[in-house]
Amino acid sequence: MAVEKIWKMREGADVENVRQLSSELGVDPVLSELLVQRGVRTFEQARSFFRPNLNDLHDPFLMQDMDKAVERVRQAVVAGEKILVYGDYDVDGTTAVSLVYSFLRRLTRQIDFYIPERYDEGYGVSYKGIDWASANGFRLIITLDCGIKANEKVEYARERGIDMIICDHHLPENELPKAVAVLDPKREDCHYPFDDLSGCGVGFKLVQAYSLRYDIPFDSLIPLLDLLVVSIASDLVSVTDENRILAHFGLKQLNVNPREGLLAMIQLSGLEPGHLTIDDIVFKIGPRINAAGRMESGRMAVELLTALDSEEAVRIGTEINEHNNERKNIDRRITQEALEMVRSGNCLSSGNATIVYNPQWHKGVVGIVASRLVEAFYKPTIVFTKSQEGLVTGSARSVHGFDLYDAIESCSDLLENFGGHLYAAGLTLKEENLPVFCERIEKFISNAIIPEMQTPVVDVDARLNFSQITPKFLRILKQFQPFGPGNSAPVFLTENVYDNGMGRKVGAEGGHLKLELIQESHPYHHISAIGFNMAYFFDHIKAGNPIDVCYSIVENYYRGTANTQLRVKDMHERDEMI
């Protein structure tokens, strides 16, 4: 049985504004209501929303230190200095490295890239990486998706004659590293108009700035946008403002002319080129790229994403895909073990937080397992495993509205290191400190969390009758894409529906529901629906009982044919039971 969810209707948009916009655009009032909810209130704003334009990208030189960064890169290119592009091992880091490396190798042969080993060096800039750069004669390191807290590492590099340019999007501390340039839209003294770029996005702004300064046509940057949209989707940054523009054109590039490495991933994922969405990246492409860093080496992901030869791309992609299959098997096993630990009470905490530890678990999947436990129990969750002798490392995931990073930071005196965001973080501490850490963080969470945060919420955008789901409605709804944080796929509520008798359990273990739904008030208008992990509702539906259903609308493509399907978020029984 799933955790019970609360349905919450979004506040109604201004009725007169909705009516006027509906009239001006000639669209269903439900669609104009969705637009107004998103801050799109006029015809001109709707035009900009539906027709993203690359000319609306922000001037990259508005970012603090951009002049310094461009000047130092130019100096290295002209002087023939060796440049090392350095990034994290996750999707954002490897796409960022691939983007900047792909651009710079057009300008110089004195270039290489470096991805730290997850289990040997850990996250971010490492002393080992700097030593490798020094031993191989590099004079400039460009960090991507990391480095904003690498104060000591920057000084260590400087002592060895190496300059650093930091491109990051994480929150900085009070004192910035003394690098040649620190590009981070979250700097307090940075007045860049949009601060939710991905790490790859910051790298793109550096490339864009260099191109502007030295008259490189912007059109030559378009092929890099397939990397950028993979980053935007996988790192869950908001798909608003500049990110909406970049994601729109990135998806176009990914669908029409993807690089060899991404084409290999698309094919290995069983996806159909030409119809890829943000969801396809989040659930299919991104996890495969991530598997390289989780199971083997993030360097393999960059080799894939920068491959110029299709045979090489397929070879590397096939190996990464095998790592992903291995990752999924390990993920399933550890998730089951963790669930059993919590249910049996054999865990470190199961009060207001879920904390589990097993020294044998694979470090590369503990973040995924933490997310699974949040789905199961809906509590702030930390999954620990052993990392080195005497040390444990953990991945933390939170519930909506609760700042788990703040909770972890309150225990910083017990930690060797930590980092992350509001809802996701990583941490390392001495094994001997684990009991007191669990006690303190459980106490912090108990004092800080409120009841509203302890029950998942389905935010419903609008009520909808099945009869309103016409080809025109779907055509316009599709133009709301790309979806993501800040522009989520609309969730609709349709009341008093039932299955036409064709409903069945599907999936390897029969855990999902495949339905053909009919609304009682429109009995001749049925529509296909899928409810993932909702098999527990099967008996109720099979008996012919009516339900209310919340869902988003998706298009599935198979051999060039599009099929509309409801992706069910939740179902509620109605009072009038059979």
Regions flagged by a language model, labelled:
Residues S344-S371:
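Flexible, glycine/threonine-enriched loop-and-boundary segments that flank and lead into catalytic domains
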Residues A135-F138, C146, N151-R294, G298-L304, ...:
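Functional cores that coordinate and move charged inorganic groups
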Residues L35, D88-D90, I142, D168, ...:
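Divalent metal-coordination and catalytic microenvironments
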Residues V100, R105, Q110, D241-M341, ...:
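Acidic, two-metal ion nucleic-acid-processing modules in DNA metabolism proteins
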Residues M1-A79, V230, K284-E319:
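Cofactor-/ligand-binding subdomain signature composed of acidic, glycine-rich
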Residues I382-S398:
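Short glycine-cluster motifs
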Residues Q64-P177, V182-L183, R333, V374, ...:
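N-terminal small/polar loop signature for handling phosphorylated ligands or for N-terminal nucleophile
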